[in-house]
Amino acid sequence: KLMRGKKENGEFMKPFSPLKWGDAFTEGNSWHYTWSVFHDPQGLIDLMGGDKAFVSMLDSVFSVPPVFDDSYYGFVIHEIREMTVMNMGNYAHGNQPIQHMIYLYNYAKQPWKAQYWLRQVMNKMYTPTPDGYCGDEDNGQTSAWYVFTALGFYPVCPGSNEYVVGAPLFKK
């Protein structure tokens, strides 16, 4: 139940590989862009068959080995390299289109999974070392993700006034 690219005539692109980077997915793959329904997480949950199936798919992002198909680019782009080095399955935090994904556990009534993975990402991908900052900054998104997440909330849907609770680093 992953998103697929379509041709101009409305047909789905074939063959389909959820691990193929590029083509229909800019600097990412279907495992990353499937979650980009910022405006309607409940609709995506329903489309996937409910909370249990949705959470299973979210879990799969972290358990699918960090393998990839780079045939569209013809070489390993830095976003792919960053994903494989972080060794968190197909979760590619260094590329912004997936950064909101962990917060989607909240919509499926499993906030403890969001809290667990948020802390994993903060502890593993943001460290006070020369290589302790993952991926691109891209207009401040990567540092904004960290600041929001450290404060304990995040705007999953840009432009809305809704924030989703996470795992704050501060007790007060």
Regions of interest found by a model, annotated:
Residues L2-L169:
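Active-site core of glycosidic bond-cleaving carbohydrate-active enzymes
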Residues K172:
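Catalytic-core signal marking the mid-to-C-terminal active-site face
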